[in-house]
A protein has these predicted regions:
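Conserved catalytic-core motifs of GNAT/GCN5-like acyltransferases
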Residues: 101-103, 116, 121-137
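Short glycine/proline-centered loop/turn elements that form peptide/ligand docking sites
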Residues: 81, 85, 108-111, 128-133
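Short coil/turn segments at alpha/beta junctions that flank glycine-rich nucleotide-binding fingerprints
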Residues: 78, 95-98
């Protein structure tokens, strides 16, 4: 059975292991620090006891920023990422969140297509932002009340 639950610093190792095979974005220490922050919310999509996907975000007033979103490579294109985004939108519409921001590499075509599906639009470009020289796209989605 698939379910979505909030996760905490005790889940850092599982998040790190998922990250290693997905992005290799954050090290274990960064995961521990991120999930210990009071202003950070993290949710995971589980199958039984295994984490298949993670989304880390924070809210400031009427804005929400997605800091990390990943699904296990073996479970991509099965709607799990969509479930995480739908959960964030559903849970935060009532909290007066008006818009959602995120940053994504201009080279990550799969992610760009995914975010386009949800209506995210590019509002800014950070030229040669990543180590590989690729641009970062700042994306925004307005939530209609």
């Amino acid at each position: 059975m698939i379910c979505i639950k909030q996760i905490y610093s005790k889940n850092s190792k599982s998040c790190y292991e998922l990250d290693l095979i997905s992005f290799n974005h954050w090290n274990l220490h960064q995961w521990e620090n991120e999930l210990e922050k009071d202003y950070i919310t993290a949710i995971a999509i589980y199958f039984k006891t295994s984490i298949l996907g993670v989304c880390v975000f924070h809210k400031i007033f009427d804005e929400l920023e997605i800091r990390y979103l990943s699904v296990h490579p073996s479970y991509k294109r099965r709607g799990l990422g969509k479930k995480l985004i739908h959960e964030i939108i559903k849970d935060n519409k009532n909290d007066k969140v008006k818009r959602i921001f995120l940053e994504v590499s201009a080279e990550n075509k799969q992610a760009l297509s995914f975010y386009e599906y949800f209506g995210f639009e590019t509002i800014s470009i950070r030229k040669k932002y990543y180590k590989d020289g690729s641009d970062a796209l700042l994306k925004e989605k307005m939530l209609n009340k």
